[in-house]
């Protein structure tokens, strides 16, 4: 089973490792759609570590089999998801609509589209107590 996830993975930390470990438990291949610097800055902030540095760290993680750039042209990750052809897309529970964030709107793909493509969505619990934003704020 191919698992796909997307994110910025800035200031890589134990929470990222745990998330990717849980992705690996879902399938035998994990592909990360790594947000480009420009895309990350468009909705959050410019990453502390540039794309090349974040990509190198992810490629070194034993739970990751591949990294592809995610710049969401036209505001949607649909083409990237189709190109990766995952069986499962994994996201953290903190982006679940029930927690006040609309992950589907952020990736620019309607929830029912995934089911029509035969792609399952798996919501992985957020690792409490650690976040890149909190680490950056302490620096």
Q: What does each of the following model-derived ranges do?
A:
Residues 1-139:
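Nucleotidyltransferase catalytic core that binds NTPs
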